[in-house]
Amino acid sequence: MAIERTLSIIKPDAVAKNVIGQIYSRFEKAGLKIIAAKMCHLSKPQAEKFYAVHKDRPFYPDLVKFMTQGPVMIQVLEGENAIVKNREIMGATNPKEALPGTIRADFADSIDANAVHGSDGPETAKEEIAFFFKPDEIF
């Protein structure tokens, strides 16, 4: 089993619901360690750059607008198979399809306001972590 790191973002909808602590508890119960964290309000250029992979998709403008509407909580998670484990905890992108007990089933309102983001693979995780954190900010 490999120790991995992954990026997690608690999106503006979940921050506004005051469920950061409940989400952190789920990470920890799954054996994921929070090794870096910060709260910030993404600027439009930051959100556009972070989600640039989706720039040709029809939902891109709404995604950028949503991600800049309020503060987000960004963290690096570390643990055995952290990427897959985090994605399992998050649940399906569409909360209506998410399994009961997942973050999205419990806290998300819609496919757009879906509470959390998580890296989808090892290379993406490295890029996303570097986007938000300098090496000396990760413990």
UniProtKB/Swiss-Prot annotation:
Please provide, alphabetically and separated by semicolons, the GO molecular function terms listed in this UniProt record: ATP binding; metal ion binding; nucleoside diphosphate kinase activity
Q: Where in the cell is it found?
A: Cytoplasm
Where ATP is bound, by residue? 11, 59, 87, 93, 104, 114
Which reaction(s) are listed as its catalytic activity?
a 2'-deoxyribonucleoside 5'-diphosphate + ATP = a 2'-deoxyribonucleoside 5'-triphosphate + ADP; a ribonucleoside 5'-diphosphate + ATP = a ribonucleoside 5'-triphosphate + ADP
Disulphide-bridged cysteine pairs: none
Its required cofactor(s), as named, are: Mg(2+)
Q: How does it assemble?
A: Homotetramer.
Matching PANTHER family, A to Z?
A: NUCLEOSIDE DIPHOSPHATE KINASE
Instruction: Outline what the protein does.
Output: Major role in the synthesis of nucleoside triphosphates other than ATP. The ATP gamma phosphate is transferred to the NDP beta phosphate via a ping-pong mechanism, using a phosphorylated active-site intermediate.
Name of the protein in its database record = Nucleoside diphosphate kinase
- Supply the source organism for this entry: Coxiella burnetii (strain Dugway 5J108-111)
